[in-house]
Amino acid sequence: MKAYTVEQGIVAPLDRANVDTDLIIPKQFLKSIKRTGFGDNLFDELRYLDEGYPGQDNSVRPKNPDFVLNQPRYQGATVLIARTNFGCGSSREHAPWALNEYGFRTVIAPSFADIFFNNCFKNGMLPVILPEDIVDQLFKECAAQEGYQLTIDLAAQEVRTPTGEAFKFEVDPFRKHCLLNGLDDIGLTLQNADAIRAYEEKTKQVRPWVFQEIN
């Protein structure tokens, strides 16, 4: 998993509350668990004017010109700002997979659905909770300035605007450690690889039948 330290990037504003996971990545695209291949269908119902289905050539589909991710000024965005209860609905982990593959490493909102919030950390993304009035301010600044960027400093737990204004955010120390060091569940386990091997060798001496192959 790629480490998250300091991220600076263009901001895309998604100005709607209660964005659920089916809107983030519709159910018809959940036929793979490879974690890849979902970015082109992120917000499919909002990005395209036709109905999406797996295997389509998205490059020839008619796009919704009014949707934020189709507007030239937001191309290359890596920071998404959203409204309350972002990521509600089903627990599909494909939602952060789609956001991540599109290019978003940070989502800023006043609140998140719990399962989506947890899944972001497991997939190298940082969900940042800021007070609603500050999120309102970010929306206004983003609308007023083309190419608006934010800097997110995980070590300092700060979101910084182009003018240098800084907003503090909270993050669980363990999750912070994992993101800073690029550790997912597998990476955390491998940190104890020597201890695991030592345990297995010891167990082979005490209970050798456990390790016998069954033909």
From Swiss-Prot:
EC number: 4.2.1.33
Record carries keyword Hydrolase: no
Gene Ontology MF, one: 3-isopropylmalate dehydratase activity
Keywords assigned: Amino-acid biosynthesis, Branched-chain amino acid biosynthesis, Leucine biosynthesis, Lyase
GO cellular component, as recorded: 3-isopropylmalate dehydratase complex
Entry keyword annotation includes Lyase: yes
Enzyme class: lyase
A biological process term (GO) from this entry: L-leucine biosynthetic process
Catalytic activity: (2R,3S)-3-isopropylmalate = (2S)-2-isopropylmalate
Pathway of action: Amino-acid biosynthesis; L-leucine biosynthesis; L-leucine from 3-methyl-2-oxobutanoate: step 2/4
Assembly behavior: Heterodimer of LeuC and LeuD.
Functional summary from the UniProt entry: Catalyzes the isomerization between 2-isopropylmalate and 3-isopropylmalate, via the formation of 2-isopropylmaleate.
HAMAP family: LeuD_type1
Protein name per the record: 3-isopropylmalate dehydratase small subunit
Protein source organism: Acinetobacter baumannii (strain ATCC 17978 / DSM 105126 / CIP 53.77 / LMG 1025 / NCDC KC755 / 5377)
